[in-house]
Structure formats: structure tokens, C-alpha cells
Amino acid sequence: MDQLFTRVARDRLTCLMLGAAEVAAALVRKRNGGVISPADFSAAMRDLRAEVLDAADFAKPPSDDVLINASVPLLEKHSINATDAVVLLAALRLAAQLRAAGRDLVLVACDRRLLRAAQAEGLLTFDPENQTQAELDALLSP
């Protein structure tokens, strides 16, 4: 994720608080599974809090009951979990706004099912665990 944070202006980054909580949960799973050390976990959580959760310059739209309810057809259509459906719908709505202004959205995620669903819905995607800096640069170039 460091490559994304160094490449993209802060005012162009958006993350649902629900999505940020999913990142925290993934870090806990990696720590509990021995994939990352307790020290690396602490550092990653500190960075997540500073760079996203507590950062005033990082857009964090809410996921309210209206958004959650509207996301149900996406979880049925793509066989994704509820959290992913909410994230996908929020991304689709933001992408529509950006595209109307001549810009686009890149959904960044590590979950393969979410990435497949996003691609099926016409979104650009980036998987920081499996794609390269060059691939990110190609997605972000004008």
C-alpha cells in the first residue's frame, strides 16, 4: 500500500470506514496466524490509524443503512459478502460521479471475489498483494 500512498495525492483517496475496519481485521488475522510479527502488526496498525482512520485529509464516507440496503442486489449477483457488497456499491457510486467529471476510480483490494465483482461491474482494480508498481502506474496515468 505504500506505493499507492506515495503515488496518489491524499485528496484523491477514499475509504469507507467499514473498509478500513476490514483492513484492521485482516492485519489481526495475519498476526494471529503468525504471518506477521507482533511488532510488524503494531506498526501496521499505527500506520493505518495515522494514514487513514484518524487522517483529516483522507475521505471516509459513511456506510449507512440506505447504502447497506441498496447493496443487497450486488451480494446476490456476485456471491460476495455483505461488507464487499457495501464497498462495491460505494465504489460504483463514486466512480459514476468521477466519470461524469472526466476522471475515474481504481478500487484497491486484496479480496479476489471483490476484485472480480468490481471488474464485472466495469471498475478498474488494483491488488497490492499481486500487482506491481508498474501496473499501478499504468492505472493511474492520465
Could you tell me what each predicted segment is?
Residues 1-19, 27-44, 129-142:
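Short, well-structured N-terminal submotif of metal-dependent ribonuclease cores
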Residues 2, 41-49, 68, 72, ...:
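Hydrophobic core segments within long, regular secondary-structure runs in both alpha-
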Residues 4, 90, 117:
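Hydrophobic/aromatic ligand-binding patch that stacks against planar heteroaromatic rings
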Residues 26, 74, 120-121:
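Residue-level signal for well-ordered alpha-helical positions
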Residues 29-65:
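Helix-adjacent hinge/juxtasegments
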Residues 54-113:
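Active-site neighborhoods of divalent-metal-dependent phosphate/nucleic-acid chemistry enzymes
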Residues 94-142:
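Acidic, PIN/NYN-like endoribonuclease modules and their adjacent C-terminal/linker elements
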